Amino acid sequence: MCKIMHKTIPKKQRQKSFYRGVRAEKLAAWWLRFKGFHIAEMRFKTKCGEIDLIARRGNLVLIVEVKARSTLLEAMEAVSRMNEKRIEAAADIWLARQKDYALLSVRFDLIAILPWRWPKHIPAFFTSDR
């Protein structure tokens, strides 16, 4: 069972955050392509949660959370345990749809988009409890 929580944030601020997030995700996708990954999904949404990017290289699947923040520490702190659980639930749904599921190795990564810097890719940012 998935819980959906809604915040009361002013519309202009939500729009600004949305477009900043979309730009950050596009930059992160470019970065992963540069590193030899194929982008399987962008903004994969389920009732349980959303995955910013799903990338593949061979049997390795990256479930990527993208955060645009001023510092790396802020980006890392922006991913709460609740976010991780939602990402895991959405990943389970995506993985269940893959024909080669049994062959896949899954990793949960973070890509931090920082001002005037290259994207910072943190492999295995968190691990699944499942």
UniProtKB/Swiss-Prot annotation:
Q: Per the UniProt entry, what species is this protein from, by scientific name?
A: Bartonella tribocorum (strain CIP 105476 / IBS 506)
- Look up the signal peptide feature and give its range: none
GO MF: nucleic acid binding
The record's annotation in InterPro entries points to: Restrct_endonuc-II-like (IPR011335), tRNA_endonuc-like_dom_sf (IPR011856), UPF0102_YraN-like (IPR003509)
Please name every pair of cysteines joined by a disulfide bond in this record: none
Q: What is this protein called?
A: UPF0102 protein BT_1882
Instruction: Supply the NCBIfam families for this chain.
Output: PRK12497.1-5
Family to which this protein belongs = Belongs to the UPF0102 family.
At the top level of its lineage, which domain of life is listed?
Bacteria
Question: Which Pfam families does its entry note?
Answer: UPF0102 (PF02021)
